């Protein structure tokens, strides 16, 4: 089932590919372990959490490289999804992506509802256009389902309530590296007493008492890049049932 989740993510979010790239600053010394370097790479973004008012991002600049034009203030993209398998061969996935253009100070995106099938059937996907004004999500498409309409209009990104100020206290993670990409992964066992875990359990139907894993993944330069990507996942999966939350916050050029 975990392979199913991996495949579904690759197919369903290949364009968005779950980024958390953007910020960079004081980085590692030669003595830092790869685990420490990965945490430092994430920290400059996660230190911004919680972003209670997303419009604050209009006044924040992320990591800039040669991909940016001089007159481009850049664009933040924030993303959260919640995926849960309800049957052995089906995975339901809902979430939102919002692009905040610092040049125009406008925010547009969409809420998505997806269902993936493991065998002999194409995935189903429906997108509902949204925009944000005065830190409020405004639904632009007609939605007949009142429950779905409410979920969209009241949606909160993980980055709006998450807090990783104690990230440096996560230690002894399981680290893996693929030098060919390069890509870097580290996993930590979380506690059900963790405030981030409590927040997720209060917002989503998570039918397990199992303490989740925090998974951090980076493709590309550890020191920062507008080309590579990072992914943060809190995985509650058990046995043959996938349950996880994906989050990213990225900073990319707005002008091509």
UniProtKB/Swiss-Prot annotation:
Highest rank taxon of the organism:
Bacteria
Tell me which residues bear the S-diacylglycerol cysteine lipid modification.
Answer: 23
Per the record, what is one GO cellular component? plasma membrane
Membrane topology type:
Lipid-anchor
Q: Output the InterPro entries linked to this UniProt entry.
A: Csa (IPR007595), Csa_sf (IPR038641)
Where is the protein situated, by its record's location annotation?
A: Cell membrane
Asked whether the keyword Iron is assigned, the reply is no
Annotated lipid attachment (N-palmitoyl cysteine): 23
Record keywords: Cell membrane, Lipoprotein, Membrane, Palmitate, Signal
| Record carries keyword ATP-binding | no
Where is the signal peptide, in residue numbers?
1-22
Q: Hey, which family's this protein in?
A: Belongs to the staphylococcal tandem lipoprotein family.
| Protein name from the UniProt record | Uncharacterized lipoprotein SAB0393
Which species does this protein come from?
Staphylococcus aureus (strain bovine RF122 / ET3-1)
């Amino acid at each position: 089932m975990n392979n199913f989740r991996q495949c579904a993510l690759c197919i369903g979010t290949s364009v968005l590919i779950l980024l958390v790239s953007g910020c960079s600053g004081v980085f590692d010394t030669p003595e830092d372990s790869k685990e420490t370097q990965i945490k430092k790479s994430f920290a400059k973004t996660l230190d911004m959490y919680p972003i209670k008012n997303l419009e604050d991002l209009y006044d924040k600049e992320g990591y800039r490289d040669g991909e940016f034009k001089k007159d481009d203030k850049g664009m933040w993209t924030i993303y959260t999804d919640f995926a849960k398998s309800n049957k052995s061969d089906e995975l339901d996935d809902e979430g939102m992506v919002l692009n905040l253009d610092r040049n125009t100070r406008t925010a547009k995106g969409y809420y998505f509802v997806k269902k993936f099938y493991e065998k002999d059937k194409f995935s189903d996907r429906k997108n509902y256009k949204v925009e944000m004004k005065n830190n409020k999500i405004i639904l632009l498409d007609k939605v007949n389902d009142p429950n779905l309409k409410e979920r969209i209009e009241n949606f909160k990104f993980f980055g709006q309530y998450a807090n990783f100020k104690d990230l440096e206290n996560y230690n002894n993670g399981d680290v893996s590296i693929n030098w060919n990409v390069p890509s870097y992964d580290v996993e930590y066992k979380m506690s059900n007493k963790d405030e981030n875990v409590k927040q997720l359990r209060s917002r989503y139907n998570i039918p397990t008492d199992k303490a989740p894993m925090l998974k951090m993944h980076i493709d590309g330069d550890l020191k920062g890049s507008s080309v590579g990507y990072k992914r943060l996942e809190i995985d509650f999966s058990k046995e043959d049932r996938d349950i996880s939350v994906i989050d990213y916050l990225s900073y990319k050029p707005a002008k091509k």
